[in-house]
């Protein structure tokens, strides 16, 4: 790798000649060496020799007696530099005065010994060998250039076959392989008419002869003429490689090595152990092998040994070089003495223990310590308690400095002695030094940026760090033995950044969702809930006070009870309140209304209150207020003395009755099953449903019993008040526990899941207070243990997800104020079923509208385009008639390599406009990844109790109004009700508007989807009340319904082949089920089980209303409920397909589902979607597949091959719209992008991912997901290259594509066209323009091989590559420096040294340093 810079390179000959220049080169790192990029390319033999300081000729390392390096060996001092500073090997020249001298006796240069970390050597190979990376890394690069297969190449390189180099007049072709026998036979036949070679020499000759420009032209012509897709792909691959070589000025023959570099000895150390043994790096073994074989080969050449021996030696040399570069890539792994594989150069770079991830991305730092944390409730929010011993060690340099300044110590040594003796003055100085010097605390795992925060230290006795309770949520810390690390920012710049950006008081809001993260939890909430509760008939009720002081006195004196209802004058108003709430009122910031706390305070209320305070009063007031709230909460939690006893778990009296009633219902279902009215699957579904309802009813009863107390008030009447039951208070306040856990304590445990994931039909009717029977306990253990196992597995998965997300998004930075785009995405309120999951306001907060938003009815301007919407604007929009808004999004932002402020909107962690330079990609990745671990860890809290949602089986109205039907096709059944036959019908509910005595439909309020087979009881246009049920359906079975009256005729339903008659063991009844008929082909070829309806009189096949024949095709698993020859009426059910008995909806679907979406994988049971709208017909089936044809009004029909026996979502003759599913299952994200476009893909990804997190109650802002999806869409695939440089089918960066098109357009050429590509996050990370970032992520060798061939330049734009080369990252405060550098405002003389040390560099270079 070479830095792309303006600095001239120094050839080795000059270095060794001029000792003085060497000193300058190595005296100290040159700060001025500035570069804008790093290029990687293949090293030529000349280049390798120019790096080298001498040839390594012997395999010896060091002399075992003297421990001195052997001459010309792997550790030779002459080549690599002296072992001791400024001292030659033989000891003739010592000390600084001889520096730069080359000793004439031992040939060692007198210089610092650290050059042994920098100087390289080389080995001249006696025969060329192939570089294994270019040979074996798929696809083989040498193979692509020569158009040979890897197998053939290996045969030549490893001396099995000869290859024809020049065919001359013979019938052979160039590049043809010959066995040894054939070769000698041909030699006899043709003599030297032709030439063939073997081994790397032959391959090298072929590479030298390769004429790249001619090959490229030939391939381009071929590409134009070929029609075969496979051939085309092959040509494109080859073309790529050839063009890469042409553009990068790499010579193909450099992939065959004639000389190999030897890395500096300090990087492959050899350490003598006691007892005369040595510990050595594996590389030395590998190098030794190469040198031994190389020397032996040279000797064989001199001895003119027979060909076969030489060939064998050459093969062994090739193998040893292979092992040195990448051990185990080909053939057997070379092992050391203890049968352990040796670590090659590739292993030094790869993986978590490789150079990239271990030393370049993760460095250990000085001035840090770690200790156990304990709670520090008396600290202020910006403080932490630091043990004195730790502080003394961490702040040593500052203390030494201060001691010298004060004249208490004359030298550093004296200061050191004073500190070691821990004299009295030292402690005083420590206090001074620490004052207002922030330290950073970090708790591993650091899942998001709030895992490191800055605090001001307070010295404490003991050895534990004290942590403020309110920051525990951000760190995810508790005090059960957690440890934290302390880091000291040293420079003044670092201290400023720590104070301004990282101080805990500046991180009140969570970057994931913009809600406060500094919120009281647990005991504090319990205390606040207790002190704001109201109780009837206690001391002081009805008293009236003139101010809060009086209330406090009355409370302290015991006259007024904490819960007494009183009146008081507060801020000039009379308020009805309680004593406890008045005590809180004292702390309320000025601008917050008293009504905000004049209520029962739960966790939700506190969060709202702090959020409101932050928006109204700013940071300082919020911090003071939260600190006071915390103190008050702790104090009253202590005074409340809330405990937990078994009698607090109140079992509802109605429980027995409810359980008995449920058992009765279950018996009835069992009876229906034994009578054969329902199938086993239906029975299972219904039973599970009954128990789900029962469990919920019992839970509701229990909550009803426990949540209120009936007491006498002061007038002697019985009144209800919120309960003071301890368990209820804990759960209701949000301090600890949940309704689900209380249900298990005092309700019933409910349904449990089997190990397979299915739900068992028999629930646990007992609760923990009653105790479980042995069987119930046994059933429970599985759920509990599974939870623990899951936790361990998923923590790792979640960490890996975060790593991939960070990697894909790390170079997404806010680059500019406004990109000026006019496109965006439309958002509306999110509705699931009948509940609004997220309001329009929530989704718009902190976003920017594309155009002005006006009220559609009043035409009032609500917000101008380009304004970031804050709480007030959002409230205005909520109260207006606006349903959806087109907003700017990171997805549609047109900024290159980043996003703009306007498209991103509000910085969630600060509540203000995002600033240029903010690393929004990393924040997005952390916000999505951090709850990932919670998702995974939350499974076991409910201990496997199956919480299965009772299925929705009807639709009722949520408001009153007028019904309108859309796309609805119905048929009337025998009972006169309408049965829905369309697949995508919707019902909209409109406001009822009176017009000339008629009720008409006004603005649309809601829309409901009505499934196929639903029975509708209200007519279109009818006026309904709130809560009217207008449609019902069976949630557990999908019916197949007749549209006309006729006689049933079976087709292809052959008993024992495609039809199975199941006789139920328990009932003795027979049900007919369609089965899989694969492999049992009937005489007629393929089977298509179906039911046809014939006319009652003429026995001809009836026609449907849409003109197609009346045939119903049956999927595998359909249960037929009619018999052949039955007379059926329109709207009758002839067969039904049972829905799968639902598995437990646990978050196990969670993390894997999120990963599946971000990796853009095809879901297991994926569905197909219609690519255009048209009429559905069934085509001729293919083996194992069913052919579906969608014919549009105009244009070509589209064919889809669907797996047989899967439930289709459409019937023959249905009209489908573009993007509609043709069968059941999850859609493939790539299909959505292709068919419906970017906006629909965004909506799909955001909604699907949010749904997983919402199940866990985790809130993430949509824009984070949009940022990641943006990064997944950075590539496009060329469909037509036009006159550009691209090749058809090539994948290129979006920015490069646009740039090339602009250039071509200017030239007057034809521009290229493309389709957008959706890449999974792993693939997107690996195809990033920065090869350093990609190599440090995964597949290091492949990435580096590819980059070297194309001579790629890494322009160091992302964060990761800058960390690796040791610069400040170009984000946040480092953004300014990188911008200045780009603008070129830093003149050549004072190139940025990234750290403000230009003047140091100047001084150092101008003054000659003299040392004695």
From Swiss-Prot:
Job of this protein: DNA-dependent RNA polymerase catalyzes the transcription of DNA into RNA using the four ribonucleoside triphosphates as substrates.
Residue numbers binding Mg(2+): 478, 480, 482
Gene Ontology annotations for the cellular component aspect, listed alphabetically: DNA-directed RNA polymerase complex
One example of a Gene Ontology biological process annotation: DNA-templated transcription
Cofactor note: Binds 1 Mg(2+) ion per subunit.
PANTHER family per the UniProt record, alphabetical: DNA-DIRECTED RNA POLYMERASE, DNA-DIRECTED RNA POLYMERASE SUBUNIT BETA
Pfam families, sorted: RNA_pol_Rpb1_1 (PF04997), RNA_pol_Rpb1_2 (PF00623), RNA_pol_Rpb1_3 (PF04983), RNA_pol_Rpb1_4 (PF05000), RNA_pol_Rpb1_5 (PF04998)
Record protein name field: DNA-directed RNA polymerase subunit beta'
EC number: 2.7.7.6
Cofactor requirements of the protein: Mg(2+); Zn(2+)
Amino acids binding Zn(2+) 2: 819, 893, 900, 903
Record's signal peptide: none
Subunit (UniProt): The RNAP catalytic core consists of 2 alpha, 1 beta, 1 beta' and 1 omega subunit. When a sigma factor is associated with the core the holoenzyme is formed, which can initiate transcription.
Disulfide bridges in this chain: none
Binding annotation for Zn(2+) 1: 88, 90, 103, 106
Source organism (scientific name): Magnetococcus marinus (strain ATCC BAA-1437 / JCM 17883 / MC-1)
Residue ranges, annotated region (Disordered): 1387-1412
Alphabetical UniProt keywords: DNA-directed RNA polymerase, Magnesium, Metal-binding, Nucleotidyltransferase, Transcription, Transferase, Zinc
SUPFAM superfamilies reported for this sequence: beta and beta-prime subunits of DNA dependent RNA-polymerase (SSF64484)
GO molecular function: DNA binding; DNA-directed RNA polymerase activity; magnesium ion binding; zinc ion binding
Domain of life: Bacteria
Family the UniProt entry places it in: Belongs to the RNA polymerase beta' chain family.
Reaction(s) the record says it catalyses: RNA(n) + a ribonucleoside 5'-triphosphate = RNA(n+1) + diphosphate
């Amino acid at each position: 790798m070479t830095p792309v810079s303006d600095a001239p390179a120094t050839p080795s000959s000059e270095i060794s000649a001029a000792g003085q220049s060497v000193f300058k080169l190595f005296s100290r790192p040159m700060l001025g060496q500035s570069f804008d990029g790093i290029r990687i390319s293949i090293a030529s033999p000349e280049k390798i020799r120019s790096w080298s300081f001498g040839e390594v000729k012997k395999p010896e390392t060091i002399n075992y007696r003297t421990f001195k390096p052997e001459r010309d060996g792997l550790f030779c001092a002459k080549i690599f530099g002296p072992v001791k500073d400024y001292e030659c090997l033989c000891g003739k020249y010592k000390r600084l005065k001889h520096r730069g001298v080359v000793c004439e006796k031992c040939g060692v240069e007198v210089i610092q010994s650290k050059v042994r970390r920098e100087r390289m050597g080389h080995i001249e190979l006696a025969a060329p060998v192939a570089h294994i990376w270019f040979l074996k890394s798929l696809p083989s690069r040498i193979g692509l250039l020569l158009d040979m297969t890897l197998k053939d190449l290996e045969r030549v390189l490893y001396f099995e076959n000869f290859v024809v180099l020049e065919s001359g007049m013979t019938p052979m072709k160039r590049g043809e392989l010959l066995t040894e026998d054939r070769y000698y036979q041909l030699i006899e036949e043709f003599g030297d008419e032709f030439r063939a070679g073997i081994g790397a020499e032959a391959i090298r000759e072929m590479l030298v002869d390769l004429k790249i420009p001619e090959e490229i032209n030939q391939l381009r012509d071929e590409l134009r003429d070929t029609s075969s897709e496979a051939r085309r792909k092959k040509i494109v691959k080859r073309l790529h490689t050839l063009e890469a070589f042409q553009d990068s000025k790499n010579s193909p023959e450099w992939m065959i090595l004639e000389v190999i570099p030897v890395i500096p000895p300090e990087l492959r150390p050899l350490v003598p152990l006691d007892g005369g043994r040595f510990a050595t790096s594996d590389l030395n073994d590998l190098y030794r092998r190469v040198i031994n074989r190389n020397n032996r080969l040279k000797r064989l050449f001199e001895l003119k040994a027979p060909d076969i021996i030489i060939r064998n030696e050459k093969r062994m040399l090739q193998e040893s070089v292979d092992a040195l570069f990448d051990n185990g890539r080909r053939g057997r792994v070379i092992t050391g003495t203890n049968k352990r594989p040796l670590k090659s150069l590739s292993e030094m770079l790869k993986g978590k223990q490789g150079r990239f991830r271990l030393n370049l991305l993760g460095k250990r730092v000085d001035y840090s310590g770690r200790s156990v944390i304990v709670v520090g409730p008396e600290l202020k929010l910006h403080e932490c308690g630091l043990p004195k011993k730790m502080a003394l060690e961490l702040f040593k340099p500052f203390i030494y400095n201060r001691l010298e300044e004060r004249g208490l110590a004359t030298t550093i040594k004296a200061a050191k002695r004073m500190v070691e003796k821990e004299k009295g003055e030292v402690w005083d100085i420590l206090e001074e030094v620490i004052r207002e010097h922030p330290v950073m605390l970090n708790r591993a795992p650091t899942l998001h940026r709030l895992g490191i925060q800055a605090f001001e230290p307070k010295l404490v006795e003991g050895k534990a760090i004290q942590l403020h309770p309110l920051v525990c949520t951000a760190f995810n810390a508790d005090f059960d033995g957690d440890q934290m690390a302390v880091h000291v920012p040293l420079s003044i710049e670092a201290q400023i950044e720590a104070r301004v950006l990282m101080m805990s008081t500046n991180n009140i809001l969570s970057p994931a969702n913009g809600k406060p993260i500094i919120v009281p939890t647990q005991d504090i909430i319990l205390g606040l809930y207790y002190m704001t509760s109201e109780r009837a008939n206690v001391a002081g009720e009805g008293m009236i006070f003139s101010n809060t002081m009086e209330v406090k006195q009355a409370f302290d004196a015991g006259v007024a009870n904490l819960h007494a209802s009183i009146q008081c004058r507060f801020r000039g108003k009379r308020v009805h309140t309680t004593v406890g709430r008045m005590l809180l009122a004292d702390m309320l910031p000025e601008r917050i209304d008293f009504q905000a706390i004049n209520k029962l305070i739960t966790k939700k209320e506190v969060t709202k209150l702090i959020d409101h305070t932050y928006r109204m009063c700013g940071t300082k007031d919020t911090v003071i207020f939260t600190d006071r709230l915390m103190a008050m909460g702790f104090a009253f939690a202590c005074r409340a003395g809330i405990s937990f006893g078994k009698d607090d778990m109140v079992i509802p009296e109605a429980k027995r009755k409810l359980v008995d009633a449920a058992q009765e219902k279950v018996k009835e279902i069992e009876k229906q099953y034994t009578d054969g009215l329902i199938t086993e699957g239906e029975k299972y579904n219904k039973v599970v449903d009954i128990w789900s309802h029962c469990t919920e009813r019992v839970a509701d009863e229990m909550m009803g019993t426990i949540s209120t107390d009936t007491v006498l008030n002061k007038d002697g009447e019985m009144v209800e008040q919120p309960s003071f039951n301890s368990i209820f208070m804990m759960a209701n306040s949000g301090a600890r526990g949940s309704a689900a856990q209380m249900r298990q304590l005092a309700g019933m445990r409910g349904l449990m899941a089997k190990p397979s994931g299915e739900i068992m039909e028999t629930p646990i009717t007992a609760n923990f207070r009653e105790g479980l029977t042995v069987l119930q306990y046994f059933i429970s253990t599985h759920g509990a243990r599974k939870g623990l196992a899951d936790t361990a597995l998923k923590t790792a998965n979640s960490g890996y997800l975060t790593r991939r997300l960070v990697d894909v998004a790390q170079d997404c930075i806010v680059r500019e104020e406004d990109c000026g785009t006019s496109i965006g995405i439309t958002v509306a309120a999110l509705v699931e079923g009948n509940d609004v999951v997220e309001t329009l306001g929530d989704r718009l907060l902190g976003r920017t509208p594309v155009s002005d938003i006006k009220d559609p009815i009043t035409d009032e301007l609500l917000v101008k385009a380009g304004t970031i919407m804050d709480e007030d604007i959002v409230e205005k929009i909520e109260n207006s008639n606006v349903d959806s808004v087109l907003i700017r999004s990171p997805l549609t932002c047109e900024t290159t390599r980043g996003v703009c402020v306007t498209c991103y909107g509000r910085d969630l962690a600060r509540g203000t406009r995002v600033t240029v330079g903010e690393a929004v990609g990393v924040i997005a990745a952390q916000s999505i990844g951090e709850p990932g671990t919670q998702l995974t860890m939350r499974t076991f809290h409910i201990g496997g109790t199956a919480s299965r949602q009772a299925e929705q089986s009807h639709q009722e109205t949520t408001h009153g109004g007028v019904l309108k039907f859309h796309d609805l096709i119905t048929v009337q059944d025998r009972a006169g009700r309408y049965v829905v036959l369309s697949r995508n019908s919707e019902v909209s509910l409109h406001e009822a508007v009176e017009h000339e005595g008629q009720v008409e439909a006004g603005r649309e309020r809601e829309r409901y989807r009505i499934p196929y087979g639903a029975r509708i009881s209200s007519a279109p246009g009818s006026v309904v009340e709130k809560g009217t049920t207008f449609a019902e359906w069976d949630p557990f079975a999908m019916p197949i319904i007749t549209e006309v009256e006729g006689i049933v005729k079976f087709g292809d339903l052959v008993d024992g082949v495609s039809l199975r008659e199941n006789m139920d063991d328990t009932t003795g009844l027979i049900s007919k089920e369609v089965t899989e008929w694969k492999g049992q082909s009937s005489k007629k070829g393929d089977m298509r089980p179906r039911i046809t309806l014939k006319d009652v009189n003429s026995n001809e096949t009836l026609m449907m209303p849409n003109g197609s024949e009346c045939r119903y095709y049956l999927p595998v698993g359909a249960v037929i409920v009619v018999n052949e020859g039955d007379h059926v009426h329109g709207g009758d059910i002839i067969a039904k397909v049972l829905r799968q008995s639902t598995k437990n909806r646990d978050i196990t679907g969670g993390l894997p589902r999120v990963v599946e979406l971000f990796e853009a994988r095809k879901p297991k049971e994926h569905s197909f979607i219609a690519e255009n709208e048209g009429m559905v017909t069934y085509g001729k089936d293919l083996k194992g597949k069913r052919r579906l044809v969608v014919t549009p009004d105009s244009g070509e029909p589209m064919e889809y091959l669907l797996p047989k026996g899967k439930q289709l979502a459409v019937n023959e003759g249905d009209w489908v719209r573009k993007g509609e599913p043709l069968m059941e299952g999850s859609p493939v994200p790539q299909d959505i992008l292709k068919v419906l476009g970017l906006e629909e893909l965004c909506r799909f990804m955001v909604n699907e991912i949010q749904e997983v997190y919402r199940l866990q109650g985790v809130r993430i802002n949509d824009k984070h997901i949009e940022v990641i999806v943006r990064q997944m869409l950075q590539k496009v695939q060329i469909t037509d290259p036009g006159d550009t440089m691209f090749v058809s089918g090539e994948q290129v960066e979006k920015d490069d594509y646009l740039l090339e098109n602009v250039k071509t357009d200017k030239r007057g050429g034809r521009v290229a066209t493309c389709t957008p590509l959706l890449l999974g996050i792993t693939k997107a990370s690996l195809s990033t323009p920065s090869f350093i970032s990609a190599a440090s992520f995964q597949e290091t060798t492949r990435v580096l091989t590819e980059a070297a061939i194309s001579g790629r330049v890494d322009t160091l734009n992302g964060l990761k590559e800058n960390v690796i080369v040791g610069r400040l990252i170009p984000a946040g405060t480092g953004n300014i420096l990188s911008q200045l550098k780009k603008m070129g405002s830093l003149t050549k003389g004072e190139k940025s040294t990234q750290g403000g040390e230009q003047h140091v560099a100047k001084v150092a270079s101008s003054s000659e340093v003299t040392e004695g």
